[in-house]
Amino acid sequence: MMCLKLNLLDHVFANPFMNAAGVLCSTEEDLRCMTASSSGALVSKSCTSAPRDGNPEPRYMAFPLGSINSMGLPNLGFDFYLKYASDLHDYSKKPLFLSISGLSVEENVAMVRRLAPVAQEKGVLLELNLSCPNVPGKPQVAYDFEAMRTYLQQVSLAYGLPFGVKMPPYFDIAHFDTAAAVLNEFPLVKFVTCVNSVGNGLVIDAESESVVIKPKQGFGGLGGKYILPTALANVNAFYRRCPDKLVFGCGGVYSGEDAFLHILAGASMVQVGTALQEEGPGIFTRLEDELLEIMARKGYRTLEEFRGRVKTIE
C-alpha cells in the first residue's frame, strides 16, 4: 500500500504538500481555504510586527513559464497571525507554520518571544524568512552570512524552540558551503526551505515595450517553471550539507513529477507557490494523485524510499 504520510518535527502530515508563504495565506479566509484543502500543511503569509500594504500595483504577473512579483511583504501584521495560530486554526485538520519576516533582528526577536508560548501550547511551527527580495532598501539577510548568523543567534536565544529558515537561492558552490556551515551552527534550526523567488528578474512585454510590474522599475522575484532547476540544486545542496536538518522544497512545482524531483533531490515537504496562485487549492489533490501514480509505476511505497536518492553520473 502506497503512503504519502510523514512524521516530522513531532507532527503528522497526511502528505508532503503545502502552500509557499505568500500564496493563499494572507487573510483568515485564505487560511481557512488552505485548511479545507487536501494539503498536508499550510504556512501563513510572512508577517511584520505592524500591518503593511506592500508595494504599489501592478506587482504580480503570471506567464506560461512562471511569474514575477514584487509584493513588498503586504500582510495583516503579526498580531493577526498570532491570533489565528492561538485561537482560530483547527490543528486536528493539519499542522500550521507561521512565517515571520521582520525588517530587523530586533523586530524578529520581539515577534518570536510572543510566538514561543503559543508554539509550546498549540504546536504551531515557525518559518523565519531571511530571503524576501522585494522590500526596497532592505537587502536579503541570507546573502550576508554574518547578518544571517546574528539573526539566527538572536532568534535561537529568544525563541528557544525548534524552527526553520526560508532561504534565497544560491548560485555558487562556495555560497552553498558557507550558508550550510552557518545553519549547522544552530541546532534549533530543524528545517531549511529552499527556495524563495529568484530575486530581481525583469520581464518586458514586447508589444507595449514596458516592464510588467510597477515597483522597483519592474524588477521582481521570479517563480514557477523558470526556477525549478535552481530550486532542485538548492534543495540537493542543503540536503547534502545539512544532514541533521530537513529540507523543504519550493520552486517550480506544477505536477506530481515536479514534486517527485524535489523529493528525489532531498525534500521532505514540498511547497507550491505560482501554480497554486494560478490553479487554486484543488491543485493539491491533483499533485497527490500524480505523485502516487509515479510511485506506483516505480514500485515505491513510501517517500523515504526515494528521498535524496538522486543518482549522479560517475
Swiss-Prot record:
Effect on the protein of changing residue 3 to R: In alleles DHOD2 and DHOD3
Pathway(s) annotated for this protein in UniProt: Pyrimidine metabolism; UMP biosynthesis via de novo pathway
Residue numbers annotated as active site: 132
Mutagenesis / variant outcome for changing residue 285 to R: In allele DHOD3
Annotated InterPro entries: Aldolase_TIM, DHO_dehydrogenase, DHOD_1A, Dihydroorotate_DH_1_2, Dihydroorotate_DH_cat
Requisite cofactors: FMN
Pfam families, A to Z: DHO_dh
Subcellular location, principal: cytoplasm
Protein keywords: Cytoplasm, Flavoprotein, FMN, Oxidoreductase, Pyrimidine biosynthesis
Flavoprotein is among the record's keywords: yes
CC per GO annotation: cytoplasm
Matching PANTHER family: DIHYDROOROTATE DEHYDROGENASE (FUMARATE), DIHYDROOROTATE DEHYDROGENASE (QUINONE), MITOCHONDRIAL-RELATED
Name under which the protein is recorded: Dihydroorotate dehydrogenase (fumarate)
The organism of origin for this protein: Trypanosoma cruzi (strain CL Brener)
Chain's gene name: pyr4
